[in-house]
Amino acid sequence: MIQENEIMVIDDFIDIEYQNQIKNILIGEETFKDYEFPWYYVDDVTVAYGESDTQHRPALTHPYVYYEGTSLGSIDSEFHKLFVPLLQRAAFKLGMPYVNALQGRSFLQFPLNLKNYDVDNPHIDLVEGHKHIVVLYYVCDSDGDTIIYNERKESETYTIKQRVTPKQGRVVIFDGWLMHTAEQPINNIRCVVNYNLN
Protein backbone atom coordinates (compact mmCIF):
# COMPACT_ATOMS: atom_id res chain seq x y z
CA MET A 1 0.00 0.00 0.00
CA ILE A 2 1.22 3.49 -0.72
CA GLN A 3 1.85 5.70 2.29
CA GLU A 4 0.26 9.09 2.87
CA ASN A 5 2.00 11.72 0.70
CA GLU A 6 4.10 9.05 -1.07
CA ILE A 7 5.01 9.31 -4.75
CA MET A 8 6.58 6.50 -6.80
CA VAL A 9 8.02 7.14 -10.28
CA ILE A 10 8.99 4.00 -12.18
CA ASP A 11 10.43 3.90 -15.70
CA ASP A 12 9.71 0.97 -18.03
CA PHE A 13 6.91 -0.11 -15.70
CA ILE A 14 5.73 -2.53 -18.38
CA ASP A 15 7.73 -4.29 -21.09
CA ILE A 16 8.44 -2.51 -24.38
CA GLU A 17 6.05 -4.70 -26.39
CA TYR A 18 3.14 -3.77 -24.11
CA GLN A 19 4.23 -0.10 -24.14
CA ASN A 20 4.15 -0.09 -27.93
CA GLN A 21 0.82 -1.92 -28.04
CA ILE A 22 -0.79 0.76 -25.85
CA LYS A 23 0.83 3.55 -27.86
CA ASN A 24 -0.16 2.08 -31.22
CA ILE A 25 -3.76 1.56 -30.13
CA LEU A 26 -4.26 4.96 -28.48
CA ILE A 27 -2.35 7.19 -30.91
CA GLY A 28 -1.56 4.88 -33.80
CA GLU A 29 -3.53 2.70 -36.14
CA GLU A 30 -3.55 -0.62 -34.27
CA THR A 31 -6.89 -2.09 -33.24
CA PHE A 32 -7.88 -3.85 -30.03
CA LYS A 33 -10.25 -6.81 -30.43
CA ASP A 34 -11.00 -5.45 -33.93
CA TYR A 35 -12.03 -2.03 -32.55
CA GLU A 36 -10.38 1.25 -33.42
CA PHE A 37 -9.79 3.42 -30.38
CA PRO A 38 -12.34 6.25 -30.14
CA TRP A 39 -11.48 9.62 -28.63
CA TYR A 40 -14.12 12.06 -27.39
CA TYR A 41 -13.82 15.84 -27.52
CA VAL A 42 -13.96 17.98 -24.36
CA ASP A 43 -14.14 21.77 -24.53
CA ASP A 44 -11.73 22.24 -21.65
CA VAL A 45 -9.63 19.52 -20.05
CA THR A 46 -8.98 21.78 -17.04
CA VAL A 47 -12.64 22.04 -15.96
CA ALA A 48 -13.64 19.45 -13.40
CA TYR A 49 -16.79 18.78 -11.44
CA GLY A 50 -18.82 21.63 -12.92
CA GLU A 51 -16.33 24.38 -12.13
CA SER A 52 -16.99 27.63 -13.95
CA ASP A 53 -13.31 28.61 -14.05
CA THR A 54 -12.22 27.65 -17.55
CA GLN A 55 -8.80 27.86 -19.16
CA HIS A 56 -10.16 27.08 -22.65
CA ARG A 57 -7.93 24.08 -23.33
CA PRO A 58 -9.71 21.61 -25.62
CA ALA A 59 -8.53 18.00 -25.61
CA LEU A 60 -9.68 14.46 -26.25
CA THR A 61 -10.65 11.92 -23.61
CA HIS A 62 -11.80 8.33 -23.32
CA PRO A 63 -13.48 6.94 -20.17
CA TYR A 64 -12.70 3.33 -19.23
CA VAL A 65 -14.23 3.11 -15.76
CA TYR A 66 -16.91 5.54 -14.64
CA TYR A 67 -16.81 6.77 -11.05
CA GLU A 68 -20.16 6.31 -9.32
CA GLY A 69 -19.23 7.47 -5.83
CA THR A 70 -18.97 3.91 -4.52
CA SER A 71 -16.05 1.63 -3.77
CA LEU A 72 -16.18 0.19 -7.30
CA GLY A 73 -16.57 2.06 -10.59
CA SER A 74 -18.56 0.72 -13.53
CA ILE A 75 -16.69 -0.40 -16.63
CA ASP A 76 -17.57 2.00 -19.41
CA SER A 77 -15.34 0.77 -22.24
CA GLU A 78 -14.14 -2.47 -23.77
CA PHE A 79 -10.70 -0.86 -23.86
CA HIS A 80 -10.43 -1.13 -20.05
CA LYS A 81 -9.29 -4.72 -20.63
CA LEU A 82 -6.20 -3.38 -22.41
CA PHE A 83 -5.01 -1.92 -19.10
CA VAL A 84 -5.78 -4.80 -16.74
CA PRO A 85 -2.18 -6.14 -16.89
CA LEU A 86 -0.86 -2.64 -16.09
CA LEU A 87 -3.23 -2.40 -13.10
CA GLN A 88 -2.27 -5.90 -11.92
CA ARG A 89 1.38 -4.85 -12.03
CA ALA A 90 0.52 -1.73 -10.01
CA ALA A 91 -1.26 -3.88 -7.41
CA PHE A 92 1.78 -6.16 -7.20
CA LYS A 93 4.13 -3.18 -6.85
CA LEU A 94 1.92 -1.81 -4.06
CA GLY A 95 1.88 -5.17 -2.27
CA MET A 96 -1.89 -5.43 -2.64
CA PRO A 97 -3.48 -8.75 -3.66
CA TYR A 98 -6.03 -6.88 -5.76
CA VAL A 99 -7.25 -3.35 -6.40
CA ASN A 100 -10.60 -1.86 -7.32
CA ALA A 101 -10.77 0.61 -10.18
CA LEU A 102 -12.86 3.57 -9.06
CA GLN A 103 -12.23 5.58 -12.22
CA GLY A 104 -10.17 5.17 -15.37
CA ARG A 105 -9.68 7.40 -18.39
CA SER A 106 -7.20 8.68 -20.92
CA PHE A 107 -6.45 12.19 -22.04
CA LEU A 108 -4.86 13.38 -25.26
CA GLN A 109 -3.71 16.99 -25.21
CA PHE A 110 -2.30 18.93 -28.14
CA PRO A 111 0.03 21.92 -28.29
CA LEU A 112 -2.19 24.99 -28.39
CA ASN A 113 -1.59 28.58 -29.37
CA LEU A 114 -2.39 30.03 -25.95
CA LYS A 115 -1.91 33.49 -24.54
CA ASN A 116 -1.58 32.03 -21.06
CA TYR A 117 0.51 28.94 -20.36
CA ASP A 118 -0.25 28.76 -16.63
CA VAL A 119 -0.51 25.20 -15.35
CA ASP A 120 -3.91 23.53 -15.37
CA ASN A 121 -6.06 23.93 -12.27
CA PRO A 122 -4.70 21.91 -9.30
CA HIS A 123 -7.18 19.19 -8.37
CA ILE A 124 -7.75 15.75 -6.93
CA ASP A 125 -9.42 13.22 -9.21
CA LEU A 126 -12.19 12.09 -6.84
CA VAL A 127 -14.14 14.54 -4.72
CA GLU A 128 -16.44 12.23 -2.77
CA GLY A 129 -13.90 11.40 -0.09
CA HIS A 130 -12.69 7.95 -1.10
CA LYS A 131 -9.12 7.23 -0.15
CA HIS A 132 -7.49 6.28 -3.42
CA ILE A 133 -4.26 5.83 -5.32
CA VAL A 134 -3.51 7.52 -8.63
CA VAL A 135 -1.82 5.40 -11.29
CA LEU A 136 -0.75 7.72 -14.12
CA TYR A 137 0.87 6.04 -17.12
CA TYR A 138 2.58 8.01 -19.90
CA VAL A 139 1.84 6.66 -23.38
CA CYS A 140 4.55 8.66 -25.16
CA ASP A 141 7.46 11.03 -24.58
CA SER A 142 6.26 14.60 -24.27
CA ASP A 143 6.52 17.89 -22.51
CA GLY A 144 3.68 18.92 -20.22
CA ASP A 145 4.99 17.83 -16.83
CA THR A 146 2.74 16.45 -14.12
CA ILE A 147 3.11 18.59 -11.00
CA ILE A 148 2.26 17.08 -7.62
CA TYR A 149 1.88 19.47 -4.71
CA ASN A 150 2.33 19.13 -0.96
CA GLU A 151 -1.20 20.40 -0.35
CA ARG A 152 -4.07 17.98 0.21
CA LYS A 153 -6.92 20.44 -0.34
CA GLU A 154 -7.57 23.60 -2.34
CA SER A 155 -5.27 26.43 -1.37
CA GLU A 156 -4.50 30.02 -2.32
CA THR A 157 -0.90 28.98 -2.98
CA TYR A 158 0.68 25.63 -3.77
CA THR A 159 4.16 24.27 -3.07
CA ILE A 160 5.59 21.74 -5.49
CA LYS A 161 6.41 18.34 -4.03
CA GLN A 162 7.55 16.76 -7.32
CA ARG A 163 7.50 17.33 -11.08
CA VAL A 164 7.39 14.38 -13.46
CA THR A 165 8.11 14.64 -17.19
CA PRO A 166 6.08 12.36 -19.48
CA LYS A 167 8.16 9.50 -20.87
CA GLN A 168 6.86 6.42 -22.65
CA GLY A 169 6.60 3.52 -20.21
CA ARG A 170 6.89 5.70 -17.11
CA VAL A 171 4.27 5.43 -14.39
CA VAL A 172 3.62 7.71 -11.45
CA ILE A 173 1.80 6.15 -8.51
CA PHE A 174 0.82 8.48 -5.70
CA ASP A 175 -1.51 9.23 -2.83
CA GLY A 176 -4.73 10.41 -4.47
CA TRP A 177 -5.28 13.13 -1.88
CA LEU A 178 -2.25 15.08 -3.09
CA MET A 179 -3.34 18.03 -5.22
CA HIS A 180 -1.85 17.75 -8.69
CA THR A 181 -2.03 19.20 -12.17
CA ALA A 182 -0.44 19.10 -15.61
CA GLU A 183 1.34 21.64 -17.72
CA GLN A 184 -0.09 22.26 -21.17
CA PRO A 185 2.21 20.62 -23.76
CA ILE A 186 3.95 23.07 -26.06
CA ASN A 187 5.99 20.87 -28.42
CA ASN A 188 4.35 17.42 -28.52
CA ILE A 189 1.08 15.66 -27.88
CA ARG A 190 0.61 14.53 -24.28
CA CYS A 191 -1.19 11.21 -23.87
CA VAL A 192 -1.84 9.60 -20.47
CA VAL A 193 -3.76 6.72 -18.94
CA ASN A 194 -5.13 7.76 -15.55
CA TYR A 195 -6.66 5.29 -13.07
CA ASN A 196 -7.87 5.86 -9.53
CA LEU A 197 -7.66 2.70 -7.41
CA ASN A 198 -8.41 1.57 -3.89
Predicted regions and their residues:
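Catalytic core of non-heme Fe(II) oxygenases with the double-stranded beta-helix
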Residues: 74-84, 88-198
